[in-house]
Design a protein with these regions (language model features):
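A ligand-binding cleft/hinge motif common to bilobed small-molecule-binding domains
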Residues: 112-121, 168-169, 192, 197-225
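Acidic, polar ligand-binding/catalytic clefts
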Residues: 79, 84-149, 218
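Bilobed "Venus flytrap"/periplasmic-binding protein-like clamshell domains
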Residues: 52-55, 66-80, 113, 132-185, ...
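Extracytoplasmic small-molecule ligand-binding "clamshell" domains
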Residues: 32-111
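Extended ligand-binding regions for polar small-molecule ligands
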Residues: 71-80, 161-162, 231-270
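Ligand-binding clefts/hinges and TM-proximal coupling segments of bilobed small-molecule sensing domains
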Residues: 27-36, 84, 164-179, 217-220, ...
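C-terminal motif of bacterial Sec signal peptides marking the signal peptidase cleavage site
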Residues: 20-24
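Periplasmic-binding protein-like
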Residues: 52, 130-138, 203, 207, ...
Length: 272
């Protein structure tokens, strides 16, 4: 009986060991590695996190397709990799904190995102691809031309953005009443319905908004903050993808593709 029990126990140990080895193999990193050494979370796709809507950088067209400046540039990267771009709409907080990249939700983030020291601590940024300026949107005819004019008035800002951070610097000094909104659409609506007197966001965003809402609004002031946008990847997690993004950007700027995309979505590119 003891012998049979020992045999059974030995067999059980072998079976458990085999299962453990099998499980170990199954847990192996299942992300696809391209010939170029680029790791992708999903085979055959470049998965990109963004936060919608943020036109002209990313938003849905009438047919529900996500389009925009960032989208077309990342399409170039996907083409270089020989894959298709897949876009995931996710809260901006998860993007700017690096969480979405760290958890493997996406390979890269493209969300009209300013490169900052704080964000560089949690993700790796590409070379800058866009120079950004903050701007103040008001209803046409309103008397506000600067932050000074908004003392004791409500100023709308978008959560987790550099526009919000810029406004916070002057909140006490200029007596601003900041009202924070989760996304751009809510911020725009707040200006339209008078919930706030004005709103701060990136100039290209307001320029696009004015195109779609002619006559009702105007950019009252611009603030040159020296900001630059960058695409991002997991911190120290995918150097080959970062390299491919930078190579694609450089190539697009050299062959005129970048200028064509810029003119399509933003307007004529300023002289360097």
């Amino acid at each position: 009986v003891r012998f049979q029990s020992a045999v059974r126990q030995a067999g059980l140990v072998v079976a458990v060991t085999a299962l453990a080895l099998s499980a170990g193999c199954a847990k192996k990193d299942d992300s696809e590695v391209q010939a170029s050494g680029v790791k992708l979370v999903q085979a055959g796709k470049l998965t990109v996190c963004t936060h919608l809507p943020y036109p002209p950088f990313q938003s849905k067209d009438a047919g529900g397709k996500v389009t925009g400046f960032d989208v077309e540039v990342m399409d170039l990267v996907a083409k270089e990799l020989g894959v298709e771009q897949t876009i995931i709409d996710t809260p901006f907080e998860g993007i700017k904190s690096g969480q979405d990249l760290n958890t493997g939700k996406c390979d890269a983030a493209a969300a009209g995102m300013t490169i900052t020291e704080e964000r560089q601590k949690v993700m790796n940024f590409s070379d800058p691809y866009f120079d950004a300026t903050q701007a103040l949107l008001v209803k046409t005819g309103k008397p506000y031309k600067s932050l000074d004019d908004l003392k004791d008035r409500k100023l709308g800002v978008q959560a987790s953005t550099t526009g919000r951070d810029y406004a916070r610097k002057f909140e006490k000094e200029k007596g601003l009443q900041l009202v924070e909104f989760e996304d751009l659409a809510a911020l725009q609506q707040a200006v339209a319905n008078g919930q706030v007197e004005a709103a701060i966001n990136d100039l290209p965003v307001w320029t696009e908004y004015l195109k779609k809402n002619p006559g009702g609004f105007e950019v009252a002031a611009e603030f040159d903050t020296g900001e630059q946008y960058g695409f991002s990847v997991k911190k120290d997690g995918n150097p080959e993808l970062l390299k491919k993004i930078n190579e694609t950007l450089a190539k697009a700027k050299q062959d005129g593709t970048y200028d064509a995309i810029y003119e399509k979505w933003i307007g004529k590119r300023p002289s360097a």
